[in-house]
Amino acid sequence: DVFNAVMQKADTTMLSEETAIGSYKLEAVEAMRDITTEAELSLEYGHPDYESSNISERDKEKKYLIRSALRLAEDLDIEHILLFTKTGRLARFAAAYRPSHMIHAFTGNIQTLRYTNILFGINPHLLPNW
């Protein structure tokens, strides 16, 4: 199940309730980590242009901006991308492209920080008073 979730490019995996309360939860998490690490080695992450017909014009602009930034980072061999987001929407658009670069998402909102923490390839940071 873990391997298939990685192959389907899930943003996150987690233990089921039975496993989370069982006697071997630490071992289960370690096994999930190992399976995920191995499975990710066989994936190729590109920048597919996902469906944009159901989003606003402003969000389309954000999506295109993120796509351009990811392609530019790839062309220039840039390892880290910084983005600033109040709602997490920009980070969600970035995660949808399954980036191969580390994306640091800065926010002043604790709920946004928690939300972006489970997104694929996003490393969230809290900026108090922003």
Where are the regions that the model predicts?
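Glycine-rich phosphate-binding active-site loops on the catalytic face of alpha/beta enzymes
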Residues: 2-25
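Terminal amphipathic helices with adjacent charged low-complexity linkers/tails
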Residues: 22-23, 29-30, 107-109, 113
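Long, charged amphipathic helices and adjacent flexible linkers at domain junctions
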Residues: 32-69
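Conserved, mostly hydrophobic/aromatic
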Residues: 5, 32, 94
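Nucleotide-binding motor/catalytic cores of P-loop/tubulin-like NTPases across gene-expression machines
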Residues: 90-92, 98-130
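Flexible, glycine/charged-enriched surface loops at secondary-structure junctions
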Residues: 16-17, 22, 41-51, 79
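Structured core elements
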Residues: 13-15, 80-83, 93, 104-105
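N-terminal active-site wall of soluble small-molecule enzyme domains
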Residues: 61-74, 81-82, 86-93
